[in-house]
């Protein structure tokens, strides 16, 4: 009996051990998860970019060496533009001849090679866009990328730019509140970059740019005073006050003064003999033998009885 009890206890212990062991009970063990499959992950779109979705998808599908995070900065040296053209024309353009740098010399050298290639292929890119892209003008690199997209894919896209690009931050300043807008000196510093002064040290050109920015700032101030008269404490003129206080019927009425043809208003109406008379006076001037006559009206006042 004791041996039978020991055998039963040994069997129960082995059964419990078998139940707890994960290798011998695969149906009770948790399923082992494999490694996640690798999938193609596209980089996020650059922040505050005004490129259309079709252009962004086109850039993502080119498999560039690095995806642009800042459009103004990453396209200014022309390296990514050269890489895009190398993908479409691998036998006519070598990427090894371009340098991915940030200095002004590197930018000018890269764009000079690109301009030679574009002239050889008879591609037309406006020089204003190239100049604005080199000097990181706001909104200009997006237009240049769209032009390159149209040249290479022969597809037309609808630009999503809010307004026309004038190579200044005028539209950005107009969206700011009045307190946050820049002054004249700050506007000149923001819109004339140091790279522009180094690439074109002509003083006359830079003075003309500064004068244009000053005039643009004056127009911006005048427009701000018109749109926000309460902020600048602008008092209405007498004419504006009069128009505001006119009644509704009188202000909506238009008075057209029409003069009938053939009707003459007499300047000096004829008065009877008892009204007035004229007397001729001869005046002789010294040194002259001619006489001038003057008409002097004399009124005859009749006394009433």
Swiss-Prot record:
GO terms for cellular component: axoneme; cytosol; intracellular membrane-bounded organelle; nucleoplasm. It comes from the Eukaryota. Highly expressed in testis, the expression is observed precisely in seminiferous tubules. It is found in: Nucleus. PROSITE patterns: CH. The keyword Nucleotide-binding does not apply. InterPro entries: CH_2, CH_dom, CH_dom_sf, Spermatogenesis_Ciliary_MAP. GO terms for biological process: regulation of cytoskeleton organization. Residues 49-155 form the Calponin-homology (CH) domain. GO terms for molecular function: microtubule binding. Keywords: Nucleus. May play a role in apoptosis regulation. This is Spermatogenesis-associated protein 4. It comes from Homo sapiens (Human). The gene is SPATA4.
């Amino acid at each position: 009996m004791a041996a039978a009890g020991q055998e039963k206890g040994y069997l129960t212990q082995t059964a419990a051990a078998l139940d707890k062991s994960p290798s011998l009970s695969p149906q009770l063990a948790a399923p082992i998860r494999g490694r996640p499959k690798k999938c193609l992950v596209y980089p996020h779109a650059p922040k505050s970019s005004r490129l259309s979705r079709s252009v962004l998808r086109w850039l993502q599908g080119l498999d560039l060496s690095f995806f642009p995070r800042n459009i103004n900065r990453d396209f200014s040296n022309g390296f990514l533009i050269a890489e895009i053209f190398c993908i479409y024309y691998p036998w006519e353009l070598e990427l090894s001849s371009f340098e991915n740098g940030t200095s002004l010399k590197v930018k000018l050298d890269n764009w000079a090679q690109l301009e030679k290639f574009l002239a050889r292929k008879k591609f037309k890119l406006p020089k204003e866009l190239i100049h604005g892209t080199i000097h990181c003008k706001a909104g200009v690199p997006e237009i240049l990328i769209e032009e390159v997209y149209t040249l290479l894919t022969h597809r037309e896209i609808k630009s999503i730019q809010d307004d026309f690009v004038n190579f200044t931050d005028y539209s950005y300043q107009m969206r700011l509140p009045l307190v946050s807008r820049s002054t004249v000196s700050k506007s000149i510093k923001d819109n004339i970059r140091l790279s522009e002064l180094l690439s074109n040290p002509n003083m006359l050109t830079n003075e003309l740019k500064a004068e244009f920015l000053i005039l643009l700032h004056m127009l911006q101030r005048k427009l701000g005073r018109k749109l926000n008269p309460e902020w600048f404490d602008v008092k209405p003129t007498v004419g504006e006050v009069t128009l505001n206080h006119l009644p509704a019927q009188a202000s909506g009425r238009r008075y057209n003064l029409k003069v009938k043809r053939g009707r003459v208003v007499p300047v000096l109406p004829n008065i009877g003999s008892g009204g007035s008379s004229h007397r001729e006076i001869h005046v002789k001037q010294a040194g002259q033998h001619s006489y001038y006559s003057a008409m002097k009206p004399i009124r005859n006042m009749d006394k009433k009885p």
